[in-house]
Amino acid sequence: MSASLAVELCGLPGAGKSTVAQAARDRLAAAGVSCDLADQDISAAAAPRRRLRRRATSALRESTTHPARTSAAAAAVLASRQSRPRDTVAVLAQWLAVRDLLAGCHRSPGVHLFEEGVLQRLWTIGLRGGYDTSARLWHNLDPARRTDLVVVLDLPATEAAARLRGRPSRHSRVQGLGSDAMLDELARGERLLSTLVAGCPVPVVHVGADVAPDAMAARVAEVVLDAWQGGRQVPQ
């Protein structure tokens, strides 16, 4: 079977995941490596109708194909005690959609880059919830539904807050908070991300996000290219 490599970016809001993913993809393509943005149709930047339709399609396919694992995932999300019922539904749909996309990626050759993959979804579940169920959700993923590599875009909470205050788009929930509350929430998110990364069962590489986007993208592309040339493949 042709080689595949699923890579996810993760980091605080404002770290530049979308910008870096697109630029890294272009750099990899220039190096002769086939690379797609695997979750672009369900990302926050996608048109709302397309995002919801694509997410619903993926979540439905995953739930009908793997009902037992879907039931276990639903129980874990419910146990996380999300702050609002609508959040419970939303994060479960996001989780199932990412599982479905990953399964498809591992059946397709090339590099598949996720702006927000497994770890970022766990971060969202943890940030909005009152109880940590990340270990249960990791256990919910068979190898074909895990990324092969996690690239953490490291950015201090203070810098993330400064970037978000100057950003015209409103993709992050924390942008609706006042300055002090935003910084507190980002600091909490920074601690949570550190905990999740420490418990991540797949390889992790850290890239500083306090540099220009082009420099970040160049480093991410280098990391991915090294992994690709090393022949890392998901177990089948």
Predicted regions and their residues:
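Walker A (P-loop) phosphate-binding loop of P-loop NTPases
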Residues: 14
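A glycine- and Lys/Arg-enriched "phosphate-lid" helix/loop adjacent to the NTP-binding pocket
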Residues: 120-133, 140-191
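N-terminal phosphate/diphosphate-binding loop that engages ATP/GTP or pyrophosphate donors
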Residues: 25-80
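NTP-dependent small-molecule kinase module
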Residues: 162-236
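Hydrophobic anchor at the beta1->P-loop junction of P-loop NTPases
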Residues: 9
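Conserved lysine of the Walker
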Residues: 17
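Glycine-rich phosphate-binding loop used to anchor ATP phosphates in small-molecule kinases
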Residues: 75-143
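Hydrophobic positions on the alpha1 helix immediately C-terminal to the Walker A/P-loop
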Residues: 20
